[in-house]
Curated annotation (Swiss-Prot):
It holds the Pfam family SurE. It comes from Maricaulis maris (strain MCS10). NCBIfam families: PRK00346.1-4, surE. One of its GO terms (cellular component) is cytoplasm. Its main location: cytoplasm. It is found in: Cytoplasm. This is 5'-nucleotidase SurE.
Length: 264
């Protein structure tokens, strides 16, 4: 359980200047007055769980409780907890609010989810928050949806003791607050990965280059998964964990390969 007036560490992958981080700070300040921010100096979307192993990390302090790090979300949470926040460690890590949904296999690319995952690995309850957009074509991002529902959902989570190896992934739909259908607790879904592709272009000098891009296509996911919930205008809440072992295959492999190593 999370204590009253918890110490909260905020991070993201869109960078210290991102609007979604401002939304997250508004959410956090509805829950506590002990809020700290350690976020990447520059955008780190798609960074996943990468660490900065080949470059020095530089910290810029905007004030006592607001800092940027010239690294990834994982770097930020690691340094925030171990080096930058004095006194007791945070009671809660919040990562987001991401500009765009983090659902299905996207969670493995996501720096937002990675920030929460690093907090979880350091023994701190952690939550990733993302605001879906792009389903209404040219409609603006509905930040007010995350802002309205973020704190009430987190308060409910405060009363839940979830396992130490689990983080909570919250995605808000591309709907105005009054049009949100409901909250659905979901499983991680699976999308058609052919939607992600390399888009070929030619620069003014005739040289080829590429941008990674998503085709504007929707899959047809089953009920009960995060994709379907977001498509249906629901808030998706998904428990994620680090153990990627596939249980059924593990048993099959033990029966086939367990014991004395084969020689032919």
């Amino acid at each position: 359980m999370i204590p009253e007036n918890p110490r909260i560490l905020l991070t993201n992958d869109d960078g210290i200047r991102a609007h979604g981080l401002k939304v997250l700070e508004k959410i956090a300040r509805q829950l506590s007055d002990d809020v700290w921010i350690v976020a990447p100096a520059e955008e780190q979307s798609g960074a996943g769980r990468s660490l900065s192993l080949h470059d020095p990390l530089r910290v810029r302090r905007f004030d006592e409780r607001r800092m940027s790090v010239s690294g990834t979300p994982t770097d930020c949470v690691l340094m925030g907890i171990q080096d930058l926040i004095p006194g007791k460690q945070p009671d809660l890590v919040l990562s987001g609010v991401n500009r765009g949904q983090n659902i299905a296999e996207d969670v493995t690319f996501s720096g937002t989810v990675a920030g929460a995952m690093q907090g979880m690995q350091l023994g701190i309850p952690s939550v990733a928050l993302s605001q879906a957009y792009g389903f209404g074509k040219d409609d603006p991002i509905q930040w007010e949806t995350a802002e309205m529902y973020g704190a009430p959902i987190l308060r409910r989570l405060f009363d839940l003791k979830w396992p130490d190896d689990v983080l909570i992934n919250i995605n808000f739909p591309d709907r105005k607050p009054g049009d949100v259908e409901e909250v659905e607790v979901t499983r991680q879904g699976r999308r058609d990965q052919h939607i992600l592709h390399a888009e070929h272009r030619v620069d003014p000098r005739g040289m080829d280059y590429y941008w990674l891009a998503f085709k504007g296509l929707l899959s047809n996911p089953p009920d009960g998964v995060d994709l379907r919930a977001i498509y249906d205008g629901k808030i998706s809440v998904t428990p994620l964990h680090m153990d990627l072992t596939h249980g059924e295959t593990l048993g099959n492999l033990k029966r086939m390969l367990g014991g004395v190593p084969p020689k032919s």
